[in-house]
Regions:
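ATP-hydrolysis module of ASCE/P-loop NTPase motor domains
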Residues: 17-18, 83-86, 105-198, 226
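Conserved helicase NTPase motor core
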Residues: 4-16, 20-23, 55, 63-64, ...
Length: 281
């Protein structure tokens, strides 16, 4: 019989509810991480699921490392010998980057690509600001500050559009002139990334989604492999993250999301409470 430890009845139910779509909502300090750890252990020990068949997405590297450590220790205490490092555990960005790296030849990126951090991205736009300043309507879009400040504003627009999976062609054909300007800004920026063999924080997920959508075999292999998906802090997910989750889980439909709708009444890097409130029942 599975040892649930100090789990209460609600947690036991969440741990053992392995099949189908599962939504777990709880406030801070109510043992959400504990429940996720036990759930992963339950899948491995009781259901015979291999580590590589489980994906767990978090929002910080610290949280991902904590999950790996706690799952490893829990399994060791139960004398279950598996390699937890084979699990897909990490932030959405690190998981998407892993998928890209494993299938690099099917992306626009070459082997020596460079990943831009926040400063690198801003500096790239600043260095190429002349490509943006002549775009029609750009002055109405940006403040009256200097090029560095305006470059930062451009990056904010770009990141938001990328994370919400906004279609460039739809932007450029919109009736609103300001939206058409945004479309041109995004188009110029993406050309810069392609020319420089670059990828940034906000486009990692976009590139991963494109890879999956454009390569049926890769998608099907991942769908076959990833039988159980668990998403922590689901209230923080944005549109593209939600799309990737349901794309990867489309075959087995075993998706568990953990979130707190009380903490989700804000947007951070595009995150929206809509995702948790609209989760399929």
């Amino acid at each position: 019989m599975f040892n649930y430890g100090n789990a209460n009845e609600a947690q036991k139910e969440a741990i053992s509810a392995t099949d189908g779509l599962v939504l777990i909502t709880a406030g801070p300090g109510t043992g959400k991480t504990f429940t996720l750890v036990k759930r992963a252990v339950y899948l491995i020990q009781e259901c015979g699921i291999k580590p590589e068949q489980i994906m767990m997405a978090t929002f910080t590297e610290k949280a991902a490392k904590e999950l790996i450590t706690r799952i490893t220790n829990e399994l060791a205490e139960r004398n279950v010998s598996v390699n937890v490092n084979e699990m897909y555990i990490g932030t959405f960005h690190s998981l998407c980057l892993r998928i890209i790296k494993e299938n690099l030849e099917f992306t626009r990126l070459k082997r020596n690509y460079r990943l831009l951090d926040t400063f690198d991205q801003k500096y790239l736009v600043f260095r190429n600001f002349h490509k943006f300043k002549n775009i029609e309507g750009i002055d109405e879009l940006l403040s009256k500050g200097g090029s560095w400040k305006r470059s930062d504003e451009i990056c904010t627009y770009i990141n938001h559009l990328s994370e919400e999976m906004v279609d460039i062609e739809a932007l450029q054909s919109d009736d609103n002139p300001g939206i058409r300007t945004l479309g041109r800004v995004l188009s110029v920026y993406q050309e810069m990334l392609e020319e420089g063999n670059l990828i940034d924080f906000s486009t990692i997920q976009t590139e991963c989604y494109k890879l999956l959508m454009q390569n049926k075999q890769i998608l099907e292999e991942l769908q076959d492999t990833l039988q159980y998906l668990m998403i922590d802090e689901y209230q923080d997910t944005n549109y593209i993250q939600e799309q990737i989750v349901f794309l990867l889980g489309a075959k087995h439909h075993n998706i568990c999301v953990v979130g707190d709708d009380d903490q989700g009444l804000y947007r951070f890097r595009g995150a929206t409470i809509r995702n948790i409130l609209e989760f399929p029942h």
